[in-house]
């Protein structure tokens, strides 16, 4: 039985090196989809590159942990910028949910202004959309706008309460990440999904060329290793051999 595989590269717009890596992994590899940071420092560069790569499906990478928000968010920003203190606020049940709702809508409209179309799907930087307080907001928004949503079902206990019209892949994996990136790891992710019986699977990845912005990231050189693996001809063959068809959230 043929299965759908979505290979989504996060962080489109983070930096030029990230953008070039994603385009390379699409053009000469197995990346079929990406998600864009509309407040990223290289988002205009990402938009420009995407015009020459119409086969690349582009979704929105909702940002609440980096850079400047598009709306006033006094309850979440410090000195006008977003940061990882969102985890502390979540633990204290002190997230400004109305501000987050407004920021989601603003980033969505900004995406449409930049790319001239709706995003294929929605996910988030550092998976913040899976926070229990934020998840219902994002689910409702995606369902209303008719766009798909990345759902990590492992931490999710209320998946049965999702709207009937909400589209997502049956499976999602963030396991292709870390210091031990290899073709074998990627194929293990596929085999695990097959054993679960998932008929559609999204695999998250972060292929990039190294630039000064990426050097400042805690996750730096493995991005280049990811790029090497994702553009391997043998990996593409092994994926097809396992009965997977490459696609995007447009196929869900």
From Swiss-Prot:
The keyword Cytoplasm applies. Keywords: Carbohydrate metabolism, Chitin degradation, Cytoplasm, Hydrolase, Magnesium, Metal-binding, Polysaccharide degradation. It comes from the Bacteria. Mg(2+) binds at residues 61, 125. Signal peptide: none annotated. One of its GO terms (biological process) is chitin catabolic process. Pathway: Glycan degradation; chitin degradation. Its cofactor is Mg(2+). CDD domains: YdjC_EF3048_like. It is an enzyme of class 3 (hydrolase). Gene3D superfamilies: Glycoside hydrolase/deacetylase (3.20.20.370). One of its GO terms (molecular function) is metal ion binding. Its EC number is 3.5.1.105. It is found in: Cytoplasm. Homodimer. PANTHER family: CARBOHYDRATE DEACETYLASE (PTHR31609:SF1), YDJC DEACETYLASE FAMILY MEMBER (PTHR31609). Involved in the degradation of chitin. ChbG is essential for growth on the acetylated chitooligosaccharides chitobiose and chitotriose but is dispensable for growth on cellobiose and chitosan dimer, the deacetylated form of chitobiose. Deacetylation of chitobiose-6-P and chitotriose-6-P is necessary for both the activation of the chb promoter by the regulatory protein ChbR and the hydrolysis of phosphorylated beta-glucosides by the phospho-beta-glucosidase ChbF. Belongs to the YdjC deacetylase family. ChbG subfamily. This is Chitooligosaccharide deacetylase. It comes from Escherichia coli O8 (strain IAI1).
């Amino acid at each position: 039985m043929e299965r759908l595989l979505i290979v989504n590269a996060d962080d489109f717009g983070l930096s030029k090196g990230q953008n070039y890596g994603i385009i390379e992994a699409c053009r000469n590899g197995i990346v079929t989809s990406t998600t864009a940071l509309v407040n990223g420092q290289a988002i205009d560069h990402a938009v420009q590159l995407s015009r020459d790569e119409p086969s690349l499906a582009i979704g929105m990478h909702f940002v609440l942990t980096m850079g400047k928000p598009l709306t006033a968010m006094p309850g979440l920003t410090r000195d006008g910028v977003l940061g990882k203190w969102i985890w502390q606020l979540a633990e204290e049940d002190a997230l400004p949910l109305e501000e987050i709702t407004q920021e989601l809508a603003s980033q969505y409209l900004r995406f449409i202004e930049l790319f001239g179309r709706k995003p294929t799907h929605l996910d988030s930087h550092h998976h913040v959309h899976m926070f229990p307080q934020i998840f219902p907001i994002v689910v409702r928004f995606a369902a209303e706008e008719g766009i798909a949503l990345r759902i990590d079902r492992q931490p999710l206990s209320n998946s049965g309460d999702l709207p009937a019209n909400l589209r997502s892949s049956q499976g999602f994996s963030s396991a292709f990440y870390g210091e031990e990136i290899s073709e074998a790891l990627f194929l293990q992710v596929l085999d695990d999904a097959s054993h679960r019986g998932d008929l559609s699977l999204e695999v998250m990845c972060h292929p990039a060329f190294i630039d000064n912005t990426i050097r400042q990231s805690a996750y730096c050189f493995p991005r280049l290793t990811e790029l090497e693996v994702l553009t391997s001809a043998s990996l593409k063959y092994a994926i097809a051999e396992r009965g997977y068809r490459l696609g995007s959230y447009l196929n869900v």
